[in-house]
């Protein structure tokens, strides 16, 4: 997969703080790789951000894209004819009860008795599903991801017009994808979402 960074991505990276450049280019490189596999005609399309910061393929609103990184973990998603969101999260070493109550709501009592490590892991899995949903919706944190009901241990669910999937059987690092249940108004041929 190792390829030179896309010239458009390098230009954007040049304006970023130095500490963010490598992370940004790694995320874009993985996204470009997935685009080459799924929508090859869009692999070199410039990427811009909408008013809320969501990445978009310039001139192609019918192909949803999403990028997430946390430390060295990177995840991307592409959806032909769909809005998509992806989130990857390294578990926190310490999770206060107040954060569990905030993000898990009525399910917090199921996680509070767990070991500190398991609390962090389970919260990370739940948070990735919540965050993937609001990324797909294009609202980010203003969409109150913590209010999305994701029961601990869940592998899939639905929130509004979005379906989410936690890749618990495929990833050791908490990673979830969300995608719209309805099509973008476009000429896209069918619905197809890929998460990596």
Report each predicted region and the residues it spans:
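Core catalytic alpha/beta fold that binds nucleotide/phospho-ligands
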Residues: 1-196
């Amino acid at each position: 997969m190792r390829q030179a960074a896309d010239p458009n991505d390098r230009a954007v990276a040049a304006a970023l703080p130095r500490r963010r450049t490598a992370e940004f280019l790694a995320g874009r490189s993985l996204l470009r790789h997935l685009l080459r596999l799924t929508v090859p005609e869009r692999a070199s399309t410039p990427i811009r951000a909408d008013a809320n910061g969501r990445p978009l393929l310039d001139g192609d609103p019918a192909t949803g894209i999403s990028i997430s990184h946390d430390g060295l973990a990177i995840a991307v998603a592409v959806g032909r004819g769909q809005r998509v969101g992806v989130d990857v999260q390294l578990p926190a070493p310490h999770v206060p009860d107040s954060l569990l109550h905030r993000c898990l709501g009525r399910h917090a009592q199921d996680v509070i008795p767990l070991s500190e490590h398991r609390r962090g892991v389970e919260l990370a899995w739940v948070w990735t599903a919540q965050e993937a949903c609001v990324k797909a919706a294009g609202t980010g944190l203003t969409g109150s991801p913590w209010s999305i009901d994701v029961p601990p241990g869940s592998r899939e669910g639905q929130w509004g017009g979005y379906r989410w999937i936690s890749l618990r059987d495929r990833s050791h690092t908490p990673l979830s994808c969300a995608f719209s249940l309805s099509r973008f108004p476009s000429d896209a041929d069918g619905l197809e979402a890929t998460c990596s």
